[in-house]
């Protein structure tokens, strides 16, 4: 049975950036990694309603900078910046003896962001909306926003069925084997009365690097 690897895996360093931008020696690496995990979990849990797509963590000597990509920046910043100050104070308890800087980045097209689409489908499933309807609506919104292709998958006891299964819906193209293809991937879980339902979303936004054919054509034209 063919298994799918994480679409970001082979693309990091080619067309995708790292979510953690720091270097540590063997002695401190594990501590930093655990700290990163705690920070991500806390921010995600604390600001779930704001639609947090991803969190970049940059480290210097005694400084940690968080770039939080969100669909609703106002919900995190709060009135007069109170929300962001509150978040910073709470994070300071997790990260001791380090100065925290928080930078909020707005996600311009949340309907084309794989993580936010997955979370939206999961929220609808928790509200007892039919999974097919939730998936198809998300696909339609994404295609209208101008993406080249989208694929969704829901796994679990769909519709309260006795036997768990996986259902896929897709539209457009999803070239998973093409490393220059900008494929965004998101995963979320819905806690329903029948158990957890996993939601996976792949979004193809177009090629990042120019195709070999185009380069050859330019070289011939210049010759």
Swiss-Prot record:
One of its GO terms (molecular function) is rRNA binding. The keyword Lipoprotein does not apply. Residues 39-108 form the KH type-2 domain. It comes from the Bacteria. One of its GO terms (biological process) is translation. This is Small ribosomal subunit protein uS3. The keyword Ribonucleoprotein applies. Part of the 30S ribosomal subunit. Forms a tight complex with proteins S10 and S14. Keywords: Ribonucleoprotein, Ribosomal protein, RNA-binding, rRNA-binding. GO terms for cellular component: cytosolic small ribosomal subunit. SUPFAM superfamilies: Prokaryotic type KH domain (KH-domain type II), Ribosomal protein S3 C-terminal domain. Signal peptide: none annotated. Binds the lower part of the 30S subunit head. Binds mRNA in the 70S ribosome, positioning it for translation. Belongs to the universal ribosomal protein uS3 family. Gene3D superfamilies: 3.30.300.20, Ribosomal protein S3, C-terminal domain (3.30.1140.32).
């Amino acid at each position: 049975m063919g298994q799918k690897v994480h679409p970001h895996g082979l693309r990091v360093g080619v067309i995708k950036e790292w979510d953690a931008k720091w270097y540590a020696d063997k002695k401190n690496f594990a501590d930093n990694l655990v700290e990163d995990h705690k920070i991500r979990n806390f921010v995600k849990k604390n600001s779930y309603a704001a639609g947090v797509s991803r969190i970049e963590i940059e480290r210097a000597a005694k400084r940690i900078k968080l770039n939080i990509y969100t669909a609703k920046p106002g919900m995190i910043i709060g009135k007069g910046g109170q929300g962001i100050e509150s978040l910073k104070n709470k994070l300071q308890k997790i990260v001791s003896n380090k100065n925290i800087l928080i930078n909020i980045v707005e996600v311009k097209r949340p309907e084309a962001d794989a993580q936010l689409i997955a979370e939206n489908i999961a929220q609808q499933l928790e509200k007892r909306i039919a999974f097919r309807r939730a998936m198809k609506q998300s696909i339609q919104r994404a295609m209208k926003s101008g993406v080249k292709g989208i694929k969704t998958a829901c796994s679990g006891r769909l519709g309260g069925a006795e036997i768990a299964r996986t259902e896929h819906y897709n539209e457009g193209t999803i070239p998973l084997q093409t490393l220059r293809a900008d494929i965004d991937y998101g995963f979320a879980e819905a806690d329903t009365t029948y158990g957890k339902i996993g939601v996976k979303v792949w979004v193809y936004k177009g090629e990042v690097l120019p195709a070999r054919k185009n380069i050859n054509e330019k070289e011939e034209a210049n010759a």
